[in-house]
Amino acid sequence: MKIKLFVIYFVAYLFVNSVSFTEEKDSQMNSYTGILDDKTSGLNVYSGMFDFSDDGQRASLIGIEHQNHNLYRDTLIGKISPVTGFFITENNASYIYTGIETNYKLGRLNITPSFTPGLYAKGDGKDLGSVIEFKSDVQLSYDIGESMNLGMSYNHVSNASLGDKNPGANSYMFNFLKKF
């Protein structure tokens, strides 16, 4: 229980005190109204199935993620911005992470790949072989309003063979993103 409280407090601290890539702000036009849009950060709440491809270790999960598009870097693949979050499974396995993402907008459809290193605690869940794990994620979402998206995402969590074993875990989630 103390670990869960620590994780919740730590993530809340990260949300309030985000580490900056850059303090530059890009003028972003709202795709609905054509006016300046200052809603460039978001909170993503998600729920789904952790390690759905392993019948013996499958578990429900719930998580939250902060996406901050105010802090970005222009690169060859687009604007990369920070993302921070955590999830916990029904077996008390938890993962806290921070990394990068980029967003590609196709009308109302959004494709958001991300890469996030983090710390994994197995609890009563699957042993992934290391405390240090890496999450590769792709999210497909649809704008349902000026500041809300609904979507689905898939991720793979793995230790990149840093541990003695590397079973990995594949997960899917349903996402609700609120921009502010």
Give names to the regions the model predicted.
Residues F50-S60, F86-Y97, D124-V131, S161-A169:
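Solvent-exposed loop/turn segments connecting transmembrane beta-strands
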Residues E23-T40, D54-D55, N70-I80, K105-I111, ...:
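Short loop/turn motifs that connect adjacent beta-strands in outer-membrane beta-barrel proteins
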Residues M1-L36:
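Cleavable N-terminal export/targeting peptides
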Residues G42-D51, I77-T89, T112-A121, S153-S158:
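Transmembrane beta-strand segments that form the barrel wall of outer-membrane beta-barrel proteins
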Residues H66-N70, T102-Y104, Y142, H156, ...:
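Residue-level signature of outer-membrane beta-barrel architecture
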Residues R58-I64, P167-F180:
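Outer-membrane beta-barrel "beta-signal"
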Residues N91-F115:
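Helix-adjacent hinge/juxtasegments
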Residues I62-H66, T98-I100, V138, F174:
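Membrane-embedded beta-strands of outer-membrane beta-barrel proteins
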